[in-house]
């Protein structure tokens, strides 16, 4: 199947998913500089919030350097052609957060739930549509649901008013074939006018391949991050995706060389550590574990002497999902006790 001439919308994750490896401590100056670089490179949609979305600032997820309001207020007036989006997880973010984001000029709201819990998104999706926002239903940890279950959940979100649905590989666990079956099933079930997106992680080095597979199966919005800055081994690396799309004749509107410069000159220098597929990030993908668990598991390793890899495998075995970061500490303590590293 040729994709030559196909148009997609690339959605940048550097300033939202990239907050995870930065422990949510990105400065306003870093946000503004990178946002301007992305805007100048032609990226049409840029996500800006705490890594866990609007209202994510907490003991459980981490306290950011600045509030969502401050980050959004700093970035939105600066971008010339790009629109700004925000992520919202019901139960973390509220309708009041949504109103605040809309008031500041956020164009797109992405309402995220676990892939089998679309029903908790109804209030937020309906409210966002009432505000006439570009409203996205974001189904996380998509590897944990069958294609049939996923399309059922996607139709719920579409019914609430979402004009775009995302198949989200939060764990970086899917392979091109499993991406195609899920994205293809959802595409077939949705109305033709409802857009379809894919969000990948690079834990098995499949970010770009999976994104291309998603485009082949009918997705037209694709998430990526400059230099891959994101949870785990990072998001699909934007500069690589853009180069591959260019070679395949897929139109993105993003400048191949300018996005490379953003990645190399602006994003890599602010990394606290290299975003790469180390054994722990690889374990996330292999075991199908939520990407933002990585740093929590590494911290628990330091505290309890249980290897992060073992903790992550156990989290996968227990079927833990996004939002259960507090269980990492609990799991590490239990494992340390069982191994005689901690007094009972």
UniProtKB/Swiss-Prot annotation:
* Active-site residues annotated for this sequence: 20 (proton acceptor)
Q: Which residues bind Mn(2+)?
A: 17, 199, 201
Alphabetized SUPFAM superfamilies for the sequence:
Aldolase, post-HMGL domain-like
Protein residues bound to substrate = 16-17, 170, 199, 290
What is a single Pfam family found in this protein's UniProt entry?
Answer: DmpG_comm
Name the residues annotated as site: Transition state stabilizer.
16
Listed GO biological process terms: catabolic process; L-leucine biosynthetic process
Coiled-coil ranges per UniProt: none
Q: Where is the Pyruvate carboxyltransferase domain?
A: 8-260
Q: Which InterPro entries match?
A: 2-IPM_HCS-like, 4OH_2_O-val_aldolase, Aldolase_TIM, DmpG_comm, DRE_TIM_HOA, PYR_CT
Q: Give the EC number.
A: 4.1.3.39
* Reaction(s) catalysed (UniProt annotation): (S)-4-hydroxy-2-oxopentanoate = acetaldehyde + pyruvate
Domain of life, source organism:
Bacteria
Q: Which GO molecular function annotations are given, in alphabetical order? A: 2-isopropylmalate synthase activity; 4-hydroxy-2-oxovalerate aldolase activity; manganese ion binding
Claim: Metal-binding is one of the keywords in the record: yes
Keywords of the record, alphabetical order, are: Aromatic hydrocarbons catabolism, Lyase, Manganese, Metal-binding
Claim: Lyase is one of the keywords in the record: yes
Task: State the similarity comment.
Answer: Belongs to the 4-hydroxy-2-oxovalerate aldolase family.
Name this protein carries in UniProt: 4-hydroxy-2-oxovalerate aldolase
Can you name the source organism?
A: Verminephrobacter eiseniae (strain EF01-2)
């Amino acid at each position: 199947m040729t994709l030559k001439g196909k148009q997609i919308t690339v959605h940048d994750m550097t300033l939202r998913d990239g907050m995870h490896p930065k422990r949510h401590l990105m400065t306003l100056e870093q946000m503004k500089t990178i946002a301007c670089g992305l805007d100048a490179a032609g990226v049409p949609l840029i996500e800006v919030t705490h890594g866990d979305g609007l209202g994510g600032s907490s003991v459980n997820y981490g306290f950011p350097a600045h509030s969502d309001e401050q980050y959004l207020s700093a970035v939105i007036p600066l971008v010339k052609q790009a629109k700004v989006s925000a992520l919202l997880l019901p139960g973390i973010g509220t309708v009041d957060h949504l109103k605040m984001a809309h008031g500041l000029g956020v164009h797109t709201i992405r309402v995220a739930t676990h892939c089998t819990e679309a029903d908790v998104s109804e209030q937020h999706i309906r409210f966002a549509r009432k505000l006439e926002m570009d409203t996205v239903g974001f189904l996380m940890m998509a590897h944990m649901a069958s294609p049939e279950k996923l399309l059922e959940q996607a139709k719920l979100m579409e019914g609430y008013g979402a004009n775009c649905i995302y198949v989200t590989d939060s764990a970086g666990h899917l392979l091109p074939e499993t991406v195609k079956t899920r994205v293809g099933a959802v595409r077939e079930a949705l109305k033709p006018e409802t857009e379809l997106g894919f969000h990948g992680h690079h834990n098995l080095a499949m970010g770009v391949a999976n994104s291309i597979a998603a485009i082949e199966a009918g997705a037209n919005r694709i998430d990526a991050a400059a230099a891959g800055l994101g949870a785990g081994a990072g998001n699909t690396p934007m500069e690589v995706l853009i180069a591959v799309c260019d070679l395949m004749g897929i139109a993105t509107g993003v400048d191949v060389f300018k996005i490379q410069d953003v990645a190399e000159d602006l994003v890599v220098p602010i990394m606290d550590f290299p975003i790469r597929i180390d054994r722990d990030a690889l374990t996330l993908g292999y075991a199908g574990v939520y990407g933002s668990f990585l740093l929590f598991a590494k911290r628990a390793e330091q505290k309890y002497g249980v290897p992060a890899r073992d903790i992550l495998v156990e989290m996968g075995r227990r079927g833990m999902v996004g939002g259960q970061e507090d269980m990492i500490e609990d799991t590490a303590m239990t494992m340390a006790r069982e191994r005689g590293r901690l007094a009972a």
